[in-house]
From Swiss-Prot:
Keywords: Cytoplasm, Lipid biosynthesis, Lipid metabolism, Metal-binding, NAD, NADP, Oxidoreductase, Phospholipid biosynthesis, Phospholipid metabolism, Zinc. GO terms for biological process: glycerophospholipid metabolic process; phospholipid biosynthetic process. Its EC number is 1.1.1.261. It is found in: Cytoplasm. This is Glycerol-1-phosphate dehydrogenase [NAD(P)+]. Zn(2+) binds at D181, H261, H277. Catalyzes the NAD(P)H-dependent reduction of dihydroxyacetonephosphate (DHAP or glycerone phosphate) to glycerol 1-phosphate (G1P). The G1P thus generated is used as the glycerophosphate backbone of phospholipids in the cellular membranes of Archaea. Transmembrane segments: none annotated. Binds 1 zinc ion per subunit. It comes from the Archaea. One of its GO terms (molecular function) is glycerol-1-phosphate dehydrogenase (NAD+) activity. PANTHER family: GLYCEROL DEHYDROGENASE, GLYCEROL DEHYDROGENASE 1.
């Protein structure tokens, strides 16, 4: 008689659970800043807000948001172009009595709003003025320290208001960096799948599918990404939001952050303020795809078509520094297993960097 036939044990109960925090309202399009008031009303966010912005982004979009939301809410304004622990603490003091937080600007502003709202247990609304990385929609925030950027877990925006006219008017370099950040999903997924096979790391098939599809759409339509075109801004912003949602589904940044991101963080430590986050991720993606045995030339060509850098020289970084970044990558978030943790020697690192320049 089989053990199951005895029926002495109670039946196993399905007890898995998953808490996913996702943006509830997403508005992307031409001249949509005016829709922030009905969105906040729909979400019942409250009657007082702290608007965090930078000097230039306040002029480009912040004042419009302030005027629109000011008709129904009391709005305080906090201006800072930098992000640091000191800035975050100062912004928290300004936000302690408000109902919600609005971030109007680029990555530093959005990340500041994200951390402040998380620490104070408030909701926040993301109003990006550039589409340079997937932080506009994700739960992750990056804070620079003396040893490089530190990635923190916060919560995603409850709403995203992205005006394509404003985003398209930003320097094309920012949009191209955003594209590269999304394209890096390709190798992030490969690393995640490898960690699942080798280390038994849990993996979300839904997050994998969404992340991969988002990267594929950008690669297949790379020739449509053009400077100062709202259609391009629309296309890239939607992809960045999808990438952020994939991370929320997974409950981690795994669907969009693998070895290429570890390389990016290492490069940022060794050559600060040289490359944008998405730019260095794009370069790292080419290397990672080569190591995975994938179509690295195709990735490189897509990045070139978009206008993103594909070599260290393109961003003013010496090849020797890039070699050191490759060797350092495995020390960044060592708990995250990637292809760069498989044992890259100095000789192979030098060859990998030279490979970027190959015909």
């Amino acid at each position: 008689m089989s053990p199951d036939a005895i029926k002495l044990l109670k039946e196993k109960v399905f007890d898995k659970s998953k808490w996913m925090q996702l943006p509830r309202d997403v508005v992307i399009g031409h001249d949509v800043l005016g829709q922030i008031a009905p969105v906040c009303e729909d979400l019942k966010l409250g009657r007082s807000a702290l608007l965090i912005s930078g000097k230039n982004t306040m002029d480009r979009a912040g004042k419009t948001v302030q005027d629109v939301i000011g008709k129904t809410c009391d709005v305080m304004v906090y201006i800072s172009d930098e992000i640091s622990p000191a800035v975050i603490k100062d912004a928290e003091k300004a936000a302690k009595d408000v109902d919600f937080v609005i971030g109007v600007g680029g990555g530093r502003v959005i990340d500041t709003a994200k951390i402040v709202s998380y620490n104070l247990d408030r909701q926040f609304v993301s109003v990006p003025t550039a589409a340079s990385h997937d932080g506009i929609a994700s739960a992750r925030a990056s804070v620079p320290t003396g040893e490089g950027n530190v990635s923190l877990e916060a919560h995603p925006p409850i709403a995203i208001i992205a005006d394509t006219c404003i985003i398209a008017s930003a320097p094309h370099r920012l949009l191209a960096a955003g594209c590269a950040d999304v394209i890096s999903n390709y190798t992030a997924i490969l690393d995640w799948e490898m960690a699942h096979r080798i280390k038994g790391e849990p993996m979300s098939e839904y997050a994998v599918a969404l992340s991969k599809m988002t990267a594929e759409i950008l690669v297949k339509n790379a020739d449509l990404i053009r400077p100062n075109q709202e259609q391009s801004a629309w296309f890239v912003t939607k992809a960045l939001v999808s990438s952020g949602v994939a991370m929320s589904i997974a409950g981690s940044s795994r669907p969009a952050s693998g070895g290429e991101h570890k390389f990016s963080h290492a490069l940022d430590r060794l050559a600060p303020n040289k490359a944008l986050h998405g730019e260095s991720c794009g370069i790292g993606t080419i290397i990672s795809m080569y190591l995975h045995g994938g179509d690295w030339r195709g990735i490189r060509q897509s990045l070139r078509t978009i206008g993103a850098p594909v070599t260290p020289t393109d961003v003013g970084i010496a090849d020797e520094i890039a070699v050191e970044a490759l060797l350092m990558a495995k020390t960044i978030r060592p708990e995250r297993f990637t292809i760069f943790d498989m044992g890259i020697t100095r000789d192979s690192a030098e060859k990998l960097i030279q490979m970027l320049y190959a015909d």
